[in-house]
Amino acid sequence: MMPGPFELIIILVIVLLLFGGKRLKDIGGDLGNAIKGFKKAMKESTDSINNKDDIVEAKIIKKEIKQEK
């Protein structure tokens, strides 16, 4: 069950009182940087896997060309 708008406002006020505006801004920035870093790592991982697949495919094609000669 999702909290309603009134409950979300109360939670936001409590969090703001606990951490303060500057600290909350820092936490948001850190969270944004963490998400950006995670997405970058996922993309690099995918690129690496695709690169390895390309190398394997090139080796297979090279073998096929040798067999045709």
UniProtKB/Swiss-Prot annotation:
Which keywords does this chain's UniProt record carry? Cell inner membrane, Cell membrane, Membrane, Protein transport, Translocation, Transmembrane, Transmembrane helix, Transport
Pfam families linked to this entry = TatA_B_E
Q: What is its main location?
A: membrane
Q: Which cell locations does it reside in?
A: Cell inner membrane
The alphabetized list of GO BP terms reads:
protein transport by the Tat complex
The disulfide bonds in this chain are: none
Q: Extract one GO cellular component term from the record.
A: TAT protein transport complex
Stated membrane topology is: Single-pass membrane protein
Q: Where are the transmembrane segments?
A: 1-21
Cited InterPro entries = TatA/B/E, TatA/E
Q: Which GO terms describe its molecular function?
A: protein transmembrane transporter activity
Q: How does it assemble?
A: The Tat system comprises two distinct complexes: a TatABC complex, containing multiple copies of TatA, TatB and TatC subunits, and a separate TatA complex, containing only TatA subunits. Substrates initially bind to the TatABC complex, which probably triggers association of the separate TatA complex to form the active translocon.
HAMAP family tied to this protein:
TatA_E (MF_00236)
Which protein family is it in?
Belongs to the TatA/E family.
Q: What does this protein do?
A: Part of the twin-arginine translocation (Tat) system that transports large folded proteins containing a characteristic twin-arginine motif in their signal peptide across membranes. TatA could form the protein-conducting channel of the Tat system.
| Protein name per the record | Sec-independent protein translocase protein TatA
Q: Which organism is it from?
A: Vesicomyosocius okutanii subsp. Calyptogena okutanii (strain HA)
